[in-house]
Amino acid sequence: DCPSDWSSHEEHCYKVFRLFKTWEEAEKFCTQQVNGWHLASIESVEEANFLAELVPKTLIKSKYHVWIGLRDQSERQQCSSHWTDGSAVSYEKVVRFTKCFGLNKDKGYLEWVTLPCEDKNPFICKSWVPH
């Protein structure tokens, strides 16, 4: 089972943090929680819909986008092929590519938005359900 204040979906645990961190600070924060946590990867439309429902429960009437575990690490303006937790990008919902990715507050957290990695936003950590 997931820790008591985390939410579960499929075989993963999630938590939205109301802390304002840059993308790198947020990823570091997730990895320091428990071994194996990262900024959330989104690997299906079902997972995207789950997170779109989860975020507003924590960030009530939020004016902020929410970091997810994807960023462009190349010189060319192309998306990285892997999430920070190492899983392959098999599902994409994005309009244009630049640097770091978040869930778009103006689209009900269903669409991705590219943001400067130095912006400070809330974020979602994700890991496998502990066995």
UniProtKB/Swiss-Prot annotation:
Organism name: Macrovipera lebetinus (Levantine viper)
Subcellular location: Secreted
Function: Interferes with one step of hemostasis (modulation of platelet aggregation, or coagulation cascade, for example).
Entries under InterPro entries matching the protein: C-type_lectin-like (IPR001304), C-type_lectin-like/link_sf (IPR016186), C-type_lectin/snaclec_domain (IPR050111), CTDL_fold (IPR016187)
Keyword entries, A-Z: Disulfide bond, Hemostasis impairing toxin, Secreted, Toxin
Pfam families recorded: Lectin_C
Keyword Disulfide bond: yes
UniProt name for this protein: Snaclec macrovipecetin subunit alpha
Expression sites (tissue/organ): Expressed by the venom gland.
Disulfide bonds: 2-13, 30-125, 100-117
GO MF terms held by the record: toxin activity
Family: Belongs to the snaclec family.
Residue ranges occupied by any C-type lectin domain in the UniProt entry: 9-126
Leader sequence residues: none
Keyword Disulfide bond: yes
Assembly and interaction partners: Heterodimer of subunits alpha and beta; disulfide-linked.
A Gene Ontology term for the protein's cellular component: extracellular region
